[in-house]
Amino acid sequence: MNKFPWLTIIVVLPIFAGSFIFFLPHKGNRVIRWYTICICTLELLLTTYAFCYHFRLDDPLIQLVEDYKWINFFDFRWKLGIDGLSIGPVLLTGFITTLATLAAWPVTRDSRLFHFLMLAMYSGQIGSFSSRDLLLFFIMWELELIPVYLLLSMWGGKKRLYSATKFILYTAGGSIFLLMGVLGVGLYGSNEPTLNFETSVNQSYPVALEIIFYIGFFIAFAVKLPILPLHTWLPDTHGEAHYSTCMLLAGILLKMGAYGLIRINMELLPHAHSIFSPWLMIVGTIQIIYAASTSLGQRNLKKRIAYSSVSHMGFILIGIASITDTGLNGAILQIISHGFIGAALFFLAGTSYDRIRLVYLDEMGGVAIPMPKIFTMFSSFSISSLALPGMSGFVAEVIVFLGIITSQKYLLMPKIVITFVMAIGMILTPIYLLSMSRQMFYGYKLFNIPNSFVFDSGPRELFVSISIFLPVIGIGMYPDFVLSLSVDKVEGILSNYFYR
């Protein structure tokens, strides 16, 4: 047990401090913006301090553990803890949310509610990544959905209500399977429910029952990741949402699905995962090709970036399915890498839309001339997304490749086929990303803009872009910075595996 409740403070602070937004004086939106940014910055500094001084990298066990009895009736506990798997996503959440609040500066309509919802979402996401009790994990998972639904339905494009309804139907449907899985695991094999994660990890289940649990959890996480064919909510949602919400969706929300797959499906149900991993590998390879091909046919800029996210999630799925140290480390690195790159691309797409009021690529052209800074940053992030050497995306995808090649679970021929199909996916990625940049920025097409004067990005937007670009370059040059966090935990997870 940790003496000082670091994690409780980190989880509760955003939503608690955010509730005071409604009592701030009515002096315009400036006070609300600065208050929210200060809370996010304080939270990020607290998280960084706690992890720097109280987290040991060489310890694969759960650290900073807090365990308090909450509801005596069925032994429900407030149990939080951090290990090598969750420390990266928690820091990513803090970083991206802080920049998303800065990106939300132009939001003026109902700005109190908007900023409160962003902070409530922050608490739910940190809580999901640090929960060590299955029911608490489910509660935090659901807590995060409500703010997202409201952010989607109240701020965004003309079809925002349709996309928000589609989002909530998909995710609520997935949550039913998650709740059934949590209760099934908790109630199995004892008179008293045991929702403690450590107890559940050491529990052995009959193979048939473990497969049922696995499928239930998998559906819940497949909606969030998203995995084909449960991905159709994502392009609609990204196409209509405000770009600060898109940053949180692409940067953090999708990563919760990947985290759940590793944390519950891999760690809790290793035998079932060993059985299903070849199917995950097949779905992952199909997803890379399908989403990349579909992205190429999208006219809408934000939908094209959304499909590129779906394609990149295929690499995470393949890394998880490889059941090797290398592959799983590559998947975790891809989670962090795409968190930065996806958030940045949506931010830059949104700032471009704010200026030219166009979202369809065939209506754009020549944007590089009036907006050279946005052009430079957009091109840089497009190149990092297509895995240019020296960028974080390249390292993550190469490590996933090595994970498949070194996997002992698969025969040589399937490994060759999967690697070949993944390579085709990597060839398709520059085709749709570079054609997007060409349609948007090059040429001399005169587009009809309400204001004849289009200004380039200001200091705030440059700060957000550069703040995301630095870790992308940093991880690309020195990936051990992220890999050192997870390598011991990955070995611990894979020590439970036997090959069937």
UniProtKB/Swiss-Prot annotation:
Q: What name appears for this protein in its UniProt entry?
A: NAD(P)H-quinone oxidoreductase chain 4, chloroplastic
Record's GO cellular component terms: chloroplast thylakoid membrane
Give the EC number(s) under which this enzyme is classified: 7.1.1.-
Q: Where in the cell is it found?
A: Plastid, Chloroplast thylakoid membrane
Q: Per the record, a Pfam family? A: Proton_antipo_M
Instruction: Please tell me whether the keyword Disulfide bond is annotated for this protein.
Output: no
Q: Which PANTHER family match?
A: NAD(P)H-QUINONE OXIDOREDUCTASE CHAIN 4, CHLOROPLASTIC (PTHR43507:SF21), NADH-UBIQUINONE OXIDOREDUCTASE CHAIN 4 (PTHR43507)
Which organism does this record belong to? Guizotia abyssinica (Niger)
Regions crossing the membrane: 4-24, 35-55, 87-107, 113-130, 134-154, 167-187, 207-227, 242-262, 272-292, 305-325, 330-350, 386-406, 416-436, 462-482
Q: Which family does it belong to?
A: Belongs to the complex I subunit 4 family.
What is the taxonomic lineage of the source species?
Eukaryota, Viridiplantae, Streptophyta, Embryophyta, Tracheophyta
Topology versus the membrane? Multi-pass membrane protein
InterPro entries xrefs:
NADH_Q_OxRdtase_chain4, NADH_Q_OxRdtase_chainM/4, NADH_UbQ_OxRdtase, ND/Mrp_TM
An example GO biological process term is: electron transport coupled proton transport
MF terms in GO: NADH dehydrogenase (ubiquinone) activity; ubiquinone binding
Does this entry carry the keyword Protease?
A: no
Checking HAMAP family in the record gives:
NDH1_NuoM
* Catalytic activity reported: a plastoquinone + NADH + (n+1) H(+)(in) = a plastoquinol + NAD(+) + n H(+)(out); a plastoquinone + NADPH + (n+1) H(+)(in) = a plastoquinol + NADP(+) + n H(+)(out)
Task: Tell me where on the tree of life, at the top rank, the source sits.
Answer: Eukaryota
